[in-house]
Amino acid sequence: MERGAGAKLLPLLLLLRATGFTCAQTDGRNGYTAVIEVTSGGPWGDWAWPEMCPDGFFASGFSLKVEPPQGIPGDDTALNGIRLHCARGNVLGNTHVVESQSGSWGEWSEPLWCRGGAYLVAFSLRVEAPTTLGDNTAANNVRFRCSDGEELQGPGLSWGDFGDWSDHCPKGACGLQTKIQGPRGLGDDTALNDARLFCCRS
């Protein structure tokens, strides 16, 4: 989906926002039926545009953009971006990568995949709690649960704690939206703070 098309979903998403599992009418083009969230996301930044897998594709894997520790007196941002790797069934040779907005720092990891055609169905964020003194990082890492029960943990950093799992998509995730704090110059940067997944049924 082009960014312009994704941006048209924002008014609808604002109406659908809830702390957990949010039901929605099926979208005629992308077929998403719900949006799942976590309650542990960081407080900074703004929600970017959603990005969706092509029709008939589901997220079977993911990769992360992570800035390594910067030491003192560096400014750590930890997790900067999430990509979903979308596949149709068990065919990984024909995949599509979707990415909502990402932060400016770090490098992308190699993708981690669910086994045997399973799809990503739920997630949990590792988030460092805000501190008034010191360097905030917000989201540090993410775990995904596959439809066969396998759990995949990304190669993020270790500050903070993993929060509760989101609700589960009935079949699989098919889209992503991220909450990003833009660069703040000499201020404290946190980059990625929160994320949402879209669920599809076909």
Swiss-Prot record:
This is Vitelline membrane outer layer protein 1 homolog. It comes from the Eukaryota. The lineage of its organism: Eukaryota, Metazoa, Chordata, Craniata, Vertebrata. Disulfide bonds join 53-86, 114-146, 169-199, 174-200. Residues 1-24 form the signal peptide. One of its GO terms (cellular component) is extracellular exosome. Belongs to the VMO1 family. It is found in: Secreted. InterPro entries: VOMI, VOMI_sf. Keywords: Disulfide bond, Secreted, Signal. SUPFAM superfamilies: Vitelline membrane outer protein-I (VMO-I). The gene is VMO1.
